[in-house]
Amino acid sequence: MAMGAVLSSRTFASPLSSSGKQHPPQNNKCTCSSPPTRDKFSRLTTRTTIFQVSNYSRSTSMERFQLSARFHQPVVDSSTNYLTRWFYNANLKRRRIECFLTSDPINTGWLKPRRWDNFTSLDTACVQPDYKIPVRTRADCKAEQYEITGSPLSPSDVPAEAVLIGDTNEISPWWQQFPKRWTVVLLCFFSFLLCNMDRVNMSIAILPMSSEFGWSPATVGLIQSSFFWGYLLTQILGGIWADRFGGKVVLGFGVVWWSIATVLTPLAAKIGLPFLLVMRAFMGIGEGVAMPAMNNILSKWVPVSERSRSLALVYSGMYLGSVTGLAFSPLLISRFGWPSVFYAFGSLGSVWFALWQRKAHSSPSEDPELSKAEKRYILGGSTLKEPVTSIPWKLILSKPPVWALIVSHFCHNWGTFILLTWMPTYYNQVLKFNLTESGLLCVLPWLTMAIFANIGGWIADTLVGRGVSITNVRKIMQSIGFLGPALFLTLLSKVRTPAMAVLCMACSQGSDAFSQSGLYSNHQDIGPRYAGVLLGLSNTAGVLAGVFGTAATGYILQKGSWDSVFQVAVVLYIVGTVVWNVFSTGEKVLE
């Protein structure tokens, strides 16, 4: 930029002059620029374009060279008809220059240059320049990494025609430069935030609803479980639909479906219990497609070097959705009544869907606004394959890594669902906390999981970036996700103070969140084309573990103690660790 200021036909106050004296304008005379030559300096000066004085840009070309050169003012000698060069001595040492251009009207002017490609001969190169609106320009240059020595230019040294060095392209706003792949990731994050907000609001609203309609505890349990009827139904179907029709269509359908079911829940409850059960099952149908569809779309948009942290961010949306739902539901119910929580949370889905339709695409090849550079980075030299038309079930179920996913997901969710479902009861019966304290402490594991899921994601991607194999990274992260909870649940039966018990529970859930960079990321590793189906298969096993584990815990507590509950979970965590480390892989096994 500093070189551009020196070569410009405008008059400048030299940045090297302590007085900041303004040079008077040059008289109009027949001058021209020398034709382009093949030396380095000419290549810099002949490929640039004119821009307005108010623009600011920085020339980074100078940062790549240590130059020792002479600046020249070419003129035409009419008697000999050849170009003569007057040189300005400058010694440049390696530093960076930041230039800030300002202008104000005054009685001086600048001359419009002529492009070299318009000149047909040296005779036509000598032209009378056009006089433009008078301006005076000052260049304030701050040298930071380049040391420049030399005497300031005199008025006669400034060429009447010059070519400005620098990139004149306007810089796009930051929101246009934000990577499109992370726009998709953030939209998936907010969809999962809404998913758990709409799911947990019933756990709070069920209390005033049961009082109003006179429901028994058995009826309350039936209502709570009806959600899983639809949720189990669409796990595998959601994966098939996503792999065949694209993640954008399926995830958008899911959010709209469960949002409508959420808004209609108060009406169904007032009509009758059967209608409420059907509406809760419908809501489960919508939420059941969310995870397979998300997994499908991110398998196409996120490169392997960013896979762990992107999935960790999306799944942390579920945890933060639970925190948000548990925090705001009591406030809405106390001020506006229990129906308000369903209306408020359900209506947010329409806002998300509008953004989703405008910004998201099922794959990079379908996005017309995606830059070529980002597309190359996402694909990593490979090409996107056509959508799946048929599912090779026999091939999928014959792969040991697929069964490692299914078994590990079952073992993982058994312990996770037990802790999240029975935690308030444990706080109340064992630690003797009241219900209010128990409710507040229930938020702590969700916050811990949200934080540590993202920490684990960054650690996993860092290891991949440093050359650790994907297989080893997945095994390391999932081993932490299994053995961490096993350790802290074992310690939980030994502690005697409530504070230590709460700390053990929080640490158990925090280490559990490392699974987002383990088995939850592995579906895209072993079969990116079938990522939706693979997640549907393993998550079906995970949901079944939650259903059976929750029921089995109640049976164990009737016959035994909490120590027995934790021991069963610890055993399954160890089994999952062994299966995962023996049979899992980070390599692609399904084409």
From Swiss-Prot:
Its main location: plastid. It is found in: Plastid, Chloroplast membrane. Residues 1-38 are annotated as: Disordered. Residues 1-76 form a transit peptide. GO terms for cellular component: chloroplast inner membrane. GO terms for biological process: monoatomic ion transport; xanthophyll cycle. Signal peptide: none annotated. Residues 8-36 have a biased composition (Polar residues). GO terms for molecular function: L-ascorbic acid transmembrane transporter activity; phosphate transmembrane transporter activity. It comes from the Eukaryota. It is a multi-pass membrane protein. InterPro entries: MFS (IPR011701), MFS_dom (IPR020846), MFS_Na/Anion_cotransporter (IPR050382), MFS_trans_sf (IPR036259), SLC17A9-like (IPR044777). Pfam families: MFS_1. Keywords: Chloroplast, Ion transport, Membrane, Plastid, Transit peptide, Transmembrane, Transmembrane helix, Transport. The chain crosses the membrane at residues 184-204, 220-240, 249-269, 271-291, 313-333, 336-356, 402-422, 440-460, 475-495, 531-551, 565-585. Probable anion transporter. PANTHER family: ASCORBATE TRANSPORTER, CHLOROPLASTIC, SOLUTE CARRIER FAMILY 17. Belongs to the major facilitator superfamily. Sodium/anion cotransporter (TC 2.A.1.14) family. This is Probable anion transporter 4, chloroplastic. The gene is PHT4;4.
